[in-house]
């Protein structure tokens, strides 16, 4: 949802499943991804700016990792050159005592920006290595925003993979992240084919779902995306993450969805913990509030699991069974 404005998801939402159907769907997910005894991991999308909009440096990332360490050791970012992300993030990953890794992002638009992104990869990956680089995403919700046609995005995924794996010689998987409905609806098939992995983003808040429907909606959306990825790949053995999901804790309502700490906590416990128990790895959007994005007239600054001062909003340990 980085750089995402409040577009309407509601018309694209699948009908919520019954509780029994959701349980069956989640069981299918588990059998398709990991052994049933293996819980999915919790990771966080991490912004590269302070609350005032200034860029983070290595010490700032180290401080982020320290407060995130009880819950995860993996984060994802969205660009390599913006805020000189790689220059300061890669040393932090290497220095942190908590063994953090990252899924790095490459922003594929516009052409000049894209060139800067690749230059950052060429400069800093050889310098710092990839021991703490789990994967690379080329774009985030590029198809959803119509930033690039699917075939052009696929070409840029191949381009970055060639740069990283062939030219630089690093065995790092390359894929992308987009809204669940773009995968489920089939318009991203050529991108699925091009990708080593797929991330599916899903925000029931932006579908206007209330507390009665948010969990069922999230699980049914995720299953629909996963099934399409498996179909296109021709195998159930795919690398698939929930790339972004979360719930705002302040700001205006959207349809029947209210933005409160209590509902965000409920969404975490009911939807996210449920799907993790079935073996799906998730990236929570996001680690910290990003105050620089706006004010109380928007929910965009308030998706953090923690406030911008790095204090926790609600329990991030799964408690319900």
Curated annotation (Swiss-Prot):
One Pfam entry name: Glyco_hydro_17
GO biological process, any: cell wall organization
GO cellular component, one term: fungal-type cell wall
One Gene Ontology MF term: glucan endo-1,3-beta-D-glucosidase activity
InterPro entries listed in its UniProt record: Beta-glucan_modifiers, Glyco_hydro_17, Glycoside_hydrolase_SF
Active site, renumbered: 141, 244
Reaction equations catalysed: Successive hydrolysis of beta-D-glucose units from the non-reducing ends of (1->3)-beta-D-glucans, releasing alpha-glucose
Enzyme Commission code: 3.2.1.58
This protein's UniProt keywords: Cell wall, Glycoprotein, Glycosidase, Hydrolase, Secreted, Signal
Signal recorded as keyword: yes
Subcellular location(s) per record: Secreted, Cell wall
Glycosylated residue positions: 39, 99, 210, 213, 237, 309, 317
Domain of life where this protein originates: Eukaryota
Annotated family: Belongs to the glycosyl hydrolase 17 family.
PANTHER family: GLUCAN 1,3-BETA-GLUCOSIDASE
Function: Glucanases possibly play a role in cell expansion during growth, in cell-cell fusion during mating, and in spore release during sporulation. This enzyme may be involved in beta-glucan degradation and also function biosynthetically as a transglycosylase.
Full protein name: Glucan 1,3-beta-glucosidase
Organism, scientific name: Schizosaccharomyces pombe (strain 972 / ATCC 24843) (Fission yeast)
Lineage of producing organism: Eukaryota, Fungi, Dikarya, Ascomycota, Taphrinomycotina
């Amino acid at each position: 949802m980085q750089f995402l404005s409040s577009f309407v998801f509601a018309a694209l939402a699948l009908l919520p499943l019954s509780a029994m159907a959701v349980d069956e769907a989640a069981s299918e997910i588990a059998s398709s991804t990991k052994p049933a005894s293996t819980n999915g991991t919790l990771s966080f999308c991490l912004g590269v700016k302070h609350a005032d909009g200034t860029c983070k440096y290595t010490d700032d990332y180290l401080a982020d990792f320290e407060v995130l360490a009880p819950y995860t050791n993996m984060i994802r970012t969205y660009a390599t050159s913006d805020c000189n992300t790689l220059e300061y993030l890669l040393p932090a990953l290497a220095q942190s005592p908590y063994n953090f890794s990252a899924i790095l992002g490459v922003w594929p638009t516009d052409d000049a920006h894209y060139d800067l992104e690749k230059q950052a990869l060429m400069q800093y990956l050889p310098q710092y290595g990839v021991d703490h680089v789990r994967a690379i995403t080329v774009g985030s919700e590029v198809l959803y925003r119509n930033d690039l046609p699917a075939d052009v995005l696929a070409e840029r995924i191949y381009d970055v993979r060639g740069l990283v794996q062939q030219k630089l010689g690093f065995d790092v998987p390359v894929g992308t992240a987009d809204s669940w409905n773009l995968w489920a609806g089939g318009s991203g098939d050529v991108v699925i084919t091009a990708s080593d992995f797929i991330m599916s983003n899903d925000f029931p808040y932006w579908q206007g779902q209330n507390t009665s429907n948010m969990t069922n909606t999230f699980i049914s959306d995720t299953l629909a995306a996963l099934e399409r990825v498996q179909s296109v790949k021709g195998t159930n053995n795919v690398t698939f993450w929930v790339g972004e999901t979360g719930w705002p804790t302040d700001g205006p309502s959207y349809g029947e969805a209210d933005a409160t700490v209590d509902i965000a906590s409920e969404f975490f416990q009911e939807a996210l913990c449920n799907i993790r128990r079935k073996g799906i790895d998730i990236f929570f959007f996001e680690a910290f509030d990003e105050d620089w994005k706006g004010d109380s007239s928007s929910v965009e600054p308030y998706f953090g699991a923690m406030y911008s001062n790095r204090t926790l909003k609600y329990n991030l340990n799964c408690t319900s069974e």
